[in-house]
Design a protein with these regions (language model features):
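Predominantly soluble domains enriched in secretory-pathway, periplasmic, or organellar proteins
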Residues: 1-343
Length: 343
């Protein structure tokens, strides 16, 4: 495998998530407190939840429209991305306390190249992917994109390319990571509003949630073509891989459910309905793999589901517009960004 120079070795060619097994925390994070960080996009605040008690232990104010809480590549920092304030606010995950705030143009979402060299800012309204030095966060290259609403990314198994979703033009972009250039665009069918994107464990396919088409596209990334489409539910939005790499959890924001896709067969294995409905958006899986945490975007709550059968463990009242919550720490050697893509 011809890896992107400088990226960590692939532990298992058949499972890119091999380092993400239950409770296999990196030495870097093993002593960090287990917390859940919730950006309240309409309250301009971050709520911090103790997952043992399901209680909020702290809330602090940030700038306008905090969208996602993002672990850094080296696992040592969390960034709160506030696109309408043009800033990132640091959280120290060793203490759960907020730190400095820095000016960053339009940070709707934040990712990291697999070699840890660059952060990639999804500057959605500016129609750019901004490559910044991962240590200093200084701009290295601003890459204009030929689409609208670029906001979610995942990387190929070898780190050589990324796929990015363009929510408002219904497209995917393929970007050469080393050369930082767009090398392809793909119009999705059925059309709609693509959201989260996630690589299959074997590295051969990408799954792309489509909120308007109510399901998930299966994409051959190497050949950059659509393979199939899996209907999951109204408003398919967030994508999370189970700790055993067997299932993909798909949050269906428009109907208050979570669909499980078997990652070997691509068949639907189950659908979990949130009692009373809801608006499950983004989130993450607990370190032990036993809980799925999701923000209730239009209900000012956070849902906690038991991954053994999908029953609701807790519904926690938070601020308005909770969005890209981060369960932290999680297993993995390094972070590719978003609310936690670990390999």
């Amino acid at each position: 495998m011809n890896l992107l120079p400088g990226m960590p070795p692939v532990l298992d060619r058949n499972d890119v998530y091999a380092a993400d097994r239950p409770n296999e925390l990196s030495p870097v994070v093993k002593d960090f407190p287990s917390l859940v960080y919730v950006p309240n996009s309409k309250s301009n605040s971050v709520s911090i939840i103790d997952p043992r008690t399901f209680k909020i232990i702290r809330t602090f104010a940030v700038g306008k429209e905090p969208q996602h809480v993002v672990p850094s590549w080296d696992l040592k920092k969390l960034w709160v991305a506030q696109d309408l304030q043009d800033q990132l606010t640091l959280i120290d995950p060793a203490t759960g306390k907020r730190g400095e705030t820095i000016h960053i143009d339009d940070p709707y979402n934040v990712y990291y190249t697999p070699d840890g060299k660059y952060s990639i800012i999804c500057a959605e309204r500016e129609r750019r992917l901004d490559f910044r030095d991962a240590k200093t966060m200084k701009v290295v290259h601003r890459l204009p994109v030929p689409c609208d609403g670029v906001n979610h990314i995942d990387f190929s198994i070898d780190g050589r390319y990324l796929l990015a979703t363009c929510e408002f033009s219904g497209e995917l972009l393929k970007v050469d990571v080393a050369n930082q250039k767009v090398i392809g665009t793909l119009k999705l069918k059925p059309a709609g509003m693509p959201q989260d994107v996630k690589l299959s464990p074997d590295g051969k396919l990408f799954y792309v949630a489509n909120m308007e088409a109510n399901g998930v596209h299966v994409i051959d990334g190497d050949n950059f073509k659509s393979i199939s489409f899996i209907p999951t539910g109204k408003g398919a939005h967030g994508l999370y891989v189970s700790r055993d790499s067997q299932y993909l959890y798909v949050s269906n924001r428009g109907e208050g459910s979570v669909t499980l896709i078997n990652l070997k067969t691509r068949a639907i294995a189950a659908k979990w309905k949130i009692p009373g409905g809801g608006s499950p958006d983004m989130g993450g899986v607990s370190a032990d793999g036993k809980q799925l945490w999701l923000s209730g975007r239009y209900d000012s709550v956070v849902y906690v589901l038991d991954t053994s059968d999908g029953h609701l463990l807790a519904k926690i009242r938070v601020g308005k517009g909770p969005h890209g919550l981060c369960v932290y720490p999680q297993p993995g050697r390094y972070s590719l960004g978003h609310t936690g893509i670990f390999r």
